Amino acid sequence: MDGLKAAVAAHEAEAIALWRRWVQRETPSGDRRALEILGHAVAAAFESLAFEAEFVADGAGAHVILRGGDGQGTKRGQNRAGGWLLLGHLDTVYPRGTAAQMPWREQDGRFYGPGVMDMKGGIALAWLALRAMQDLNQAASTAVATGSSSPRHPPGAAAITILLVSDEETGSAGSRALTEKLARASEAVLVLEPGGGESGKLKTARKGIANFVLRAEGKAAHAGVDFFAGANAIIELARQAAGLAGWSQEARGITVNCGVIRGGTRGNVVPAEAELVVDARAWTARDLQAIETRIRALEAVDPKVRLTVSGGLNRPPMERSAEGTKLFARAQEAGRAVGVVIEECATGGGS
């Protein structure tokens, strides 16, 4: 694998330059124009590797599909079931102006800046890997042509599709169907999110996420003149939150977080309305469904208050599977070939 290391080293500086430009181009979620500009810049970089770009319009900003050939004559525009999908996103959580306060910089071998890891670094890394593979493929083809090697399927010759969405940080509402369609048509999906911990462990399991809003409708009243005629919506949700706090189970990895509560108008008025925002996570679809069933069955403690629940599943869990275990084993084998120890981890963060 000395050839691979040499190919990576040959293009590392170019990949870092792309990475820097992409980080300096701010792309907060919802800034459609900024996301479209970055999408075209990223597409141009991959077009230099003979990928073809397609832009799928969406309210959040265009999603970018980049299609590469398979090395055996398949056209890029064809449906290539069984290929590999590299999945990423263009948007970041940072508001516009962050780059001025936290500019791109390199210090002690580390790089800093808004979105430098999540996930413009992942996109740059994909570009570098594919550029290195292109060198290896060209070297293999030259060896065959000169008779110094026998014909073989060149490294990385599987059909590769890259999907970069514009709304991941806000829940992927507009890109979900597209992502699922491309993923189902693929042999494997590699997500370009940062690895786990300092060693960059591969994330082979993720918790699923469900988001809910509990709304309480009570009755307003003057706190000094007619207190007992009122029905306190905030108190109702405080009681509900206290109950939900007992649903988390550390041993099973189930968490139910009451993260935001809003309500009331002023201190001397019994609040008639309030809402509670709940984030629920679990390792399995079964546990997440059980939480949703329980939340939807909640009833108001105060009979004078009306309680409603909205929301539901945001991201399904990525449970460890036999197929995923096999894919990770392939990654470990590839790592050993170049002297890299690859480990796995599970994370509660969604993607």
Predicted ranges, named:
Residues 20, 43, 124-131, 176-179, ...:
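Predominant activation on well-ordered alpha-helical scaffold segments within soluble catalytic domains
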Residues 83-85, 111, 187-191, 213:
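Short glycine-aspartate micro-motif
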Residues 91-107, 190, 205-215, 333:
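Acidic-glycine-rich active-site phosphate/pyrophosphate-binding loop
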Residues 107-118, 341-345:
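Short pre-catalytic strand/loop immediately N-terminal to key active-site residues, enriched for Gly-Thr
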Residues 111-124, 231-234:
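Short, conserved micro-motifs enriched in small and acidic residues
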Residues 119-144, 149-205:
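Acidic/histidine-rich catalytic neighborhood of metal-dependent amide-processing enzymes
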